[in-house]
Amino acid sequence: MILQKKLSICADDFGITEKVNKVIIRLIEAKRITETSCMVISDFFFEDAKQLIKYRNNIGIGIHLTLTDFIPLSKIKSLTNNGKLIGVTNLFMKSVFQNYSESEIYKEINLQLDKFEKALGFRPDFIDGHHHIHQLPLINNIIIGIIKKRYPGTYPWIRNSNESFFRILKRKTSIIKSIFLSVMGVKIKKLAKENSIKTNNGFSGVYNFSIDKDYGQLFKNFITDINSEHLIMVHPGENDEILSNIDSANKSRNLEFNYLISEKFSQVLIKNNI
């Protein structure tokens, strides 16, 4: 008997624009994804979040913590420039040198969790981060502390981007970027284990968001040699002027959606016993 593998397919960025929200809802209804993570900091989250409530028992609904590029919910002076959160490169450098206010980050993350719970009426099933910021030095410890304090005994699980070096090589897709994110995920995975917080077992979905790539082939690479409880991040959507102004991956979102909604996607999962 061949055991079926359990695969998590998480659509990131619910809330980023109305069109992305509609695409994610359509994928949920078609049973093509298993989770979505919500960008509560965006202006397009709160009203559309109500549409997710009826799918509460069908998919995992998590929070996509955001500390880059958008306008924060609080006055977080150490991470903003003219009222807007700094870019991911600057945040990475600040995290390495711990050049920011822990109390400001603590407050901002709690406010984002408050907004999620107010919109949906329940705590997030899991926690991850826009640009993987939840894994950055110090921020990872802050998040673990918040989880333990806010949700004693019922911890949300947390995403990690750690993956086997040999599996990354085997998949032959954005190898350097995948290795970087894998290293980045080591600490949060360790912290989760030490604190009895569940986390995924394997990670893929990393590529350069090029529209010249065959996303169907990329996805086949993503599911090469996976563990049970492996997680693939996806970024489906529909491009428009709003998305173009805030998201570098805007053009590839259409390609991802078209593949995920297609019959080819379903057949690939069946063929690979997923």
What residue spans do the PLM features occupy?
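DG-centered beta-turn motif at the end of beta-strands
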Residues: 11-15
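Terminal accessory/targeting
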Residues: 1-8, 18-59, 66-126, 136-274
